[in-house]
A protein has these predicted regions:
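Zinc-dependent deaminase catalytic domain
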Residues: 1-177
Length: 177
């Protein structure tokens, strides 16, 4: 495949990533076969569900005692002010939190592969373009769907998905657009 097409398809995957309603990470994936896009996907909640992909995970009161301030801000990067009131007074408190992805969120790759099945298309011999490297579960789906090559943009902290694909003799290539 020509380099300019590879860049164009990866840019398309990045464009679909912007459709994600997730706040932590936007991921897009497209499946290409015979020089045409046959499926797209991005991370998000199942069809018909609300679009809130994350829960707030609040810092426990004990955590402040054993972590220095820099570690607290790194682990719980967000804060919000909450008004607490009783019958006689009200006051504001700051609470730190991090965003935790809900278990129900579908990954971009699994969404793209599910759409293939829904439309009666085959992934056999296709190429997948993903904005981020796939997790292990998505890599299993990629393998089972018959996709022969994967291009990805950013590496994710867990490389087990890439290792699985390579073990299955699926070509994997990281590209920067």
């Amino acid at each position: 495949m020509k380099q300019k097409l590879i860049k164009a398809y990866m840019t398309t995957a990045q464009t679909f990533a912007e459709c994600s309603t997730a706040r932590r990470l936007h991921v897009g994936a497209i499946v290409v076969k015979d020089d045409r896009i046959i499926s797209i996907g991005y991370n998000g909640m199942p069809s018909g569900w609300d679009n809130d992909c994350e829960d707030k995970d609040y810092m426990s009161r004990d955590a402040g005692g054993w972590l220095d301030p820099e570690e607290i801000y790194e682990r719980w990067p967000f804060d919000e002010t909450v008004v607490v009131a009783n019958d006689s007074e009200s006051f504001e408190i700051d609470r730190r939190y991090r965003l935790k992805t809900k278990a129900e969120v579908l990954h971009a790759e699994s969404n793209a592969i599910a759409k293939l099945a829904k439309c009666g298309e085959s992934g056999e011999g296709a190429i997948m373009f993903i904005t981020h490297s796939p997790c292990l579960d998505c890599s299993k789906l990629i393998y089972q769907s018959g996709i022969k090559k994967v291009y990805f943009g950013q590496a994710y902290r867990d490389s087990s998905g890439i290792e699985f694909l390579e073990k299955c003799k699926i070509e994997v290539e990281q590209i920067n657009v």
